[in-house]
Amino acid sequence: MKKIKLFSIAAAFVAAFAFTSCNTGDDNNSYYQPLTQAEKQTCYFKTAGNRMSKLAYMSDEHVTAKDGKKEYYDTLDVVTSIHGEGKDTVMTVNNFPVKVFARYIPENADTKELKEALKKNELPVNFKSIVYYYSVTPVIQFMLFPDAISVNLEYGGATHKVKFYCYSSGNSRYTFGQVTQDKGKVEAYLVVYGYEVDPKDEKKPNPTAFNFNMAGTQLSNGTQIKFFQP
């Protein structure tokens, strides 16, 4: 399986997003103007369809050396599409291998059965994200507002509903999509930050944050996953 580096392309968007987001609250001193309908259509035509078929995620079980440095990423096949659904443009991910999240759940007695059940789960899941086109030049960029990712797991003598939560673009500058300048290919990034077992109130999530060791580094602020067009 091919290993790639997820974060190398994100920096340009982060800088642009951080700059414009600081200048949207004052109409007299605003650098950002919402896209026109024609510009949104241009963005849609450049991103719509079944373009992104690969998923990249952090994994210290898959290690490669590049230029003397170790990289901890793996790629898998997924089915991802962007289409207009009524008033909204939606990114739909099908065949998502939710078992990859097992490595990010804290290791303790309370989570042992959950982690084992998740590792063994071979049934992929589907989820959606609302797409909001943000920029058409110099790079087409879009915000993402993802639904929770849900799976039913059998363990401990019962069926449990487990939900995984992603930051929206409104809460994380590392959740976004774009068309690359060099090759004109579509890619999207999501930050998954936590999970909840058998939610008491699905309208008011109360997730447990991911907390995991990746190649000797303790991480507790989520993990970024990438969908991309090969």
Q: Where in this protein do the model-derived segments appear?
A:
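Tryptophan-anchored aromatic micro-motifs
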Residues: 41-66
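Edge beta-strand at a domain terminus
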Residues: 27-37, 164-168, 177-230
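Bacterial Sec-dependent N-terminal signal peptides
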Residues: 3-45, 227-228
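Coil residues (strongly favoring Ser/Thr
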Residues: 42, 75, 88-89
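Predominantly extracellular/secreted and cell-surface proteins with exposed
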Residues: 84-174
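Generic short beta-strand segments
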Residues: 52-61, 95-99, 145-152, 156, ...
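Acidic, glycine-anchored loop motifs typical of Ca2+
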Residues: 61-73, 202-203
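Polybasic, proline/glycine-rich intrinsically disordered low-complexity segments
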Residues: 77, 81-83
